[in-house]
Amino acid sequence: MGIRLLCRVAFCFLAVGLVDVKVTQSSRYLVKRTGEKVFLECVQDMDHENMFWYRQDPGLGLRLIYFSYDVKMKEKGDIPEGYSVSREKKERFSLILESASTNQTSMYLCASSL
């Protein structure tokens, strides 16, 4: 019984190791003047349908800004005000701040899933 369980656990770890998803966000650090338009790009390489933009402020958890479940299909999250998004290609999801303000100073995170 013990060796079969060990083999199953090892197989699970091997299966997890075969998946190498890459989600790239640009820019890592970005400083803009108040009122400027800001573009944040997110690119994933696993042909995922779903992509998400989150914001995390000090002392708070992640808050969903926008999500997309396919090309040109986008939905507002919990805090969409002041933001827009674009998804013309499956692998790319852009977050746009039309007019940057000091209350948008934050850490922005992009994610993707099947």
Curated annotation (Swiss-Prot):
From the Swiss-Prot or TrEMBL record, give the protein name.
T cell receptor beta variable 28
GO terms for molecular function, please? peptide antigen binding
Bridged cysteine pairs (disulfide) = 42-110
Q: Which organism is it from?
A: Homo sapiens
Which residues belong to the signal peptide in this entry? 1-26
Keyword Isomerase found: no
Compartments it resides in: Cell membrane
Ig-like domain spans which residues?
27-114
